[in-house]
Each structure stands twice: as structure tokens, then as C-alpha cells.
Amino acid sequence: MQSKRECEQWCERVNPENKAALEAWVRETGIRLVQVNGQRKYGGPPPGWVGSPPPSGSEVYIGRLPQDVYEHQLIPLFQRVGRLYEFRLMMTFSGLNRGFAYARYSSRRGAQAAIATLHNHQLRPSCQLLVCRSTEKCELTVDGLPLSLNRRALLLALQPFGPCLQETLLLPSPGSAPSQIALLKFSTHRAAAMAKKALVEGQSRLCGEQVAVEWLKPDLKQHFRQQLAGPSLRFLRPDVSQLTQTREKLGSQGARAALQLLCQRMKLGSPVFLTKCLGTGPAGWHRFWYQVVIPGHPVPFSGLIWVVLASDWQDGHEVAKDAVSAQLLEALSEPRTSLWSPGAEAGTMVKQ
């Protein structure tokens, strides 16, 4: 088994010419390169940058790199087509690159110019670069949240991530255990990666619960899009007087009666509820599929909801209808614009 010093000596012997050229270029230009978690980075932001980071779509993926190529050959090349905000070269422990890098420009136009100009660029004989739009991961899932957690409490727990957190959804977990899953959308991949690292290094606990933190998988994203695809409540937005009367009804007779009154005031007709119990969990939790048909609206509202029954004599279907009514009323009274899909709040679980 090699000692640490022997490993260091072996790494020093790998690609010495290009390493020396890189060091000379760094001294000459004064450029600052930082090694972070298996990648070497320039910028993010670069010197003299003022303002917010570039928008999504401003980063390109660079593939088919010879492993002995370094920044002194790549950064000047990619700076020719636009101003670089950040350049990241993926590295091995030996000091060779891993065959790919990422270049983020100050605008989407710079990224488009890089693709148009440098894709298939011949860096060396028989070595053509692959340059394409980077698929930036900006979305996380936090699974295993308690059923009692509401959206406001979740947002309070996520406050440390600040304005980089653009969207938060709280939905029924697709797993078999009765729990919730949060979908978090960040402004940049870097912000999402830092949030993931913080959550994982915090022993993956959020709101006092053990949770699983992962990148949002494409199939799961599609699943939620299909589940949430539905009518937007903004087309049913009531006026202030109608909401005031509805809240009075809510306090005296319950959510379903309040929703019935609101629909009548808006001349939409009486809502019709369809529910189906999909299974049960521990501590009296029941999972329901629901659909609410409002005659004056062209498309029904549907989704999943967990409810808990206070006693054996309670009718789970009636409890589910009341819970869904409360959600529809909340969505009507608190306008939201979702980056995921219209009607996203329809999946939030409640406890009765």
C-alpha cells in the first residue's frame, strides 16, 4: 500500500509539462483558480462582477476533453465568444481532468454563441469538442416529512436558504409510508447544491424529522406534473366581499358549507365531490383520491390527500371532503403563481 507521500509524488509526475504551463499562465494573468469538491473553478462571480448571477440557460457543457488539457488552454478559448461568469473543470485526484467542464456566461446569448462557434471545434488533431447547453439541476426533493407539517411551517424552516429558493411545494409522498415530500426549486444549480449539502450535512433532518434529500429525478417530476396538471384557481378568484361572507360561514358551519356558499355567490353552482380511499397508514391516517366538480368551471379539481380520523365512527369520505374544501378555499383566498404547474397546492395534506 502506498503512503500519502508516495501518492503525492506519483501525482506530481503525471502531466508535468501542462501543469507547469498552467502555473505559468496563472502567474502571468493573475487569474484565481480554486479547487472545490473535485472541481477547479474560476469566477462565480469573476472580478468586477456587479449584480445577480446570470439566468438559467447561460451555462454550457464541454465534453470530449483530453485529460491533460487545463484552464490555460480552455478559458481563453471560451472567452473569445462572450464574457465568462464561471468556468469549472472537473478533476481527478491525480491532477488530470475528468474529460468535461462547464462554462457559464454572463448571459444566455454568450452560451448560444459558444455552442454555435465552439461545438466540434478541433482542439487537437482528431479531438473535436462537444459543446451543448448544460442541463442545470436546480430542483431538490425532501422526502419523509410529517403529515402534520403545513406549508407555512416548511417555509419557516427553509428561511436560511433565502431568496435563492424560488418555489416550494408540499405534496403527498409517492412512497408507501404516510408522509409528505417537498419539492424545492432554486435559482441556480450552485444554490441548489449548497442547500443539498447543508441539508445532508445537517444529518438530513428538517422540521425535526429524518428526511431523504435528493436531486429531483425526471420520472418523479413527470409524475407530479401529471398529478398537478389541472385547472388554475386564478380563473375562480372571488372578490373581497365574497371572501368575507365565506370566512364568516367557515367559522360557523365548516369548510364545505363555506365553499358551497362561495360557489353560489359566484354563480358557479354547487360543488360535487368524488372520493376514493387508496389505503391506510399508522395512527389512523387514511389516503384519499378526490375530485371536485364545480358546474361553472370547465375542468374538475383532483388530487391526493391524507386525513386522520379522530374516532372509529367518523366517515373518512366526509372528513376528506371537508379537508379538500378547506384547501380550495385557501387557494382561492391566497393567489399563488407556481413554477411547477397550476393548482399545485391541491396536493397538500391536512390533519382533521
From Swiss-Prot:
GO biological process: 3'-UTR-mediated mRNA destabilization; germ cell development; negative regulation of miRNA-mediated gene silencing; spermatogenesis
Nucleus found in the keyword field: yes
GO MF, any single term: mRNA 3'-UTR binding
Cleavable signal peptide: none
Function summary: RNA-binding factor that positively regulates gene expression by prohibiting miRNA-mediated gene suppression. Relieves miRNA repression in germline cells. Prohibits the function of several miRNAs by blocking the accessibility of target mRNAs. Sequence-specific RNA-binding factor that binds specifically to U-rich regions (URRs) in the 3' untranslated region (3'-UTR) of several mRNAs. Does not bind to miRNAs. Isoform 1 may play a role during primordial germ cell (PGC) survival. However, does not seem to be essential for PGC migration.
Disease involvement: Defects in Dnd1 are the cause of the Ter mutation phenotype. Ter mice are characterized by primordial germ cell loss and susceptibility to spontaneous testicular germ cell tumors (TGCT). They are sterile, but viable. Isoform 1 defects may be the cause of tumor development.
Full protein name: Dead end protein homolog 1
Protein source organism: Mus musculus (Mouse)
Lineage of origin: Eukaryota, Metazoa, Chordata, Craniata, Vertebrata
